[in-house]
Amino acid sequence: MEVMSHLVHWVFLAVYMYELNAELISHLHPPEQEISTDSCVFPFVYADGFHYSCISLHSDYDWCSLDFQFQGRWRYCTAQDPPKCIFPFQFKQKLIKKCTKEGYILNRSWCSLTENYNQDGKWKQCSPNNF
């Protein structure tokens, strides 16, 4: 009977150590997070607002939605994610077909993020490559 009692204790110890080892392995080697390669959608709707570029709302890092109406699908932004300029776009009484310095007091080129800047007021500064 005493041998059986020792055997039961050893079995419990072995099971406990196995579970502890499995838990330790899962902490040391967590499953890798899948990184989405889906494109950001601009504009997207989140928190009752339209967003025309990556945002850091509720996050430490910029992110974007993968759907027009945010449905929980998102990814962190990269340098390749800024929204694209929309050409042509309406500015004042003109139809602008490329980045322009008109109306920018810092004399830098800019573009609209929508077809009608007059209506939406969404813009970004152009990069040296004008995108």
Curated annotation (Swiss-Prot):
Distribution of this protein across tissues and organs: Epididymis.
Highest taxon above the source species: Eukaryota
Any one GO MF annotation of this record: heparin binding
Disulfide bridge map: 40-64, 54-77, 85-111, 99-126
Cellular component aspect of the GO annotation: extracellular region
Keyword terms of this UniProt record: Disulfide bond, Repeat, Secreted, Signal
InterPro entries reported in the protein's UniProt record: FN_type2_dom, FN_type2_sf, Kringle-like, SP_Capacitation_Regulator
Residue intervals of the Fibronectin type-II domain: 35-79, 80-128
Signal sequence range: 1-22
Localization per record: Secreted
Function, as annotated: Binds sperm in vitro but has no effect on sperm capacitation. Also binds gelatin and heparin, but not chondroitin sulfate B or phospholipid liposomes.
Family that this chain belongs to: Belongs to the seminal plasma protein family.
Protein name (Swiss-Prot/TrEMBL): Binder of sperm protein homolog 2
Organism listed in the record: Mus musculus
Gene label: Bsph2
